[in-house]
């Protein structure tokens, strides 16, 4: 009498995520050169490159204006190499990198309509905070002669960026750059990437929006430093966008809030002439 056949076990399925996940499970540090390490590097580039291109183009433009040569003076009269023209180049590089690299591929299904109103509220609050130093009643309360400095900065910025100086097409490109390109690039860099990357290079192993006080405050501080003389409102803005990101766990909510702030500032400077914020 033949023994009954014992069914063989079903073949094991590969782990979700493909070979990279098989090489290193979530939470396990990736070995240098491993598939997981390469995947993390690609994700880091997708999050950081648009913002870094923006900063690089901005620094190159500033360096261009510092070169004391007759060639530079002649080139400054060319529209493409004016401040507004250089800003258009920044915008094209940043927006092109965003569309090419698509960092949102690492945040599938993150946006929820319920986050629209909180994001717009945060954006409006940050706008009010940002624009407050330019208000006349606030200038009278400053313990230093801030009003004169603001007026000087406004006059210099108006000469570079106002539609009367640049034309409406370049002004519209500037609005696109500040209201969409850099707003989105900054949130994918500061909140979606750096908040986690300062804790581990394997940043995708950390859940989106996970709160970690030291990294949260550090990122807000560096975000503030990026904004130079407006570091104080910059720090508070970094806290506001960061809190929204942590509470919603949605990078799109932070992007929308940042875009709302910048677009409101664009409308504000056009209506009031406070070009120092532009």
Protein language model features and the residues they cover:
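Juxtamembrane helix-loop-helix connectors linking adjacent transmembrane helices
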Residues: 74-80, 107-183, 199-208, 275
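N-terminal membrane topogenic signal
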Residues: 34-50, 210-211
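Transmembrane helix-loop junctions in multipass membrane proteins, especially transporters and channels
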Residues: 66-71, 102-107, 135-139, 143, ...
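Short, Lys/Arg-rich, polar N-terminal cytosolic tail immediately upstream
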Residues: 2-5, 13-40
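Structural signal for the C-terminal ends of transmembrane alpha-helices
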Residues: 96-108, 129-134, 244-248
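Transmembrane helix-loop-helix hairpins at the membrane interface
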Residues: 161-278
């Amino acid at each position: 009498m033949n023994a009954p056949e014992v069914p063989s076990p079903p073949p094991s399925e590969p782990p979700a995520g493909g070979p990279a996940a098989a090489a290193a499970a979530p939470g396990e540090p990736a070995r240098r050169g491993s598939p997981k390490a390469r995947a993390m590097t690609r994700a880091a580039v997708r999050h950081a490159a648009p913002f870094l291109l923006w900063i690089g183009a901005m620094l190159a433009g500033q360096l261009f204006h510092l070169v004391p040569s007759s060639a530079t003076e002649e080139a400054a009269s060319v529209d493409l190499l004016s401040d507004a023209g250089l800003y258009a180049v920044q915008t094209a590089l940043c927006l092109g990198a965003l569309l090419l690299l698509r960092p949102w591929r690492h945040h599938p299904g993150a946006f929820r309509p319920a986050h629209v109103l909180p994001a717009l509220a945060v954006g409006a609050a940050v706008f009010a905070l940002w624009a407050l130093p330019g208000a006349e009643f606030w200038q009278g309360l400053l313990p230093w002669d801030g009003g004169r400095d603001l007026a000087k900065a406004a006059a210099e910025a108006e000469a570079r960026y106002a539609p009367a100086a640049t034309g409406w097409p370049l002004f519209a490109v500037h609005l696109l750059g500040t209201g969409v390109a850099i707003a989105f690039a900054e949130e994918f860099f500061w909140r979606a990437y750096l908040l986690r990357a300062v804790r581990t290079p394997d940043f995708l192993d950390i859940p989106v929006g996970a709160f970690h006080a030291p990294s949260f405050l550090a990122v807000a501080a560096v975000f503030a430093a990026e904004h130079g003389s407006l570091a104080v409102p910059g720090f508070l803005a970094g806290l506001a966008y960061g809190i929204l990101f942590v509470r919603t766990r949605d990078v799109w909510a932070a992007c929308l809030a940042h875009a709302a702030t910048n677009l409101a500032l664009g409308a504000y400077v056009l209506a009031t002439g406070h070009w120092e914020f532009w």
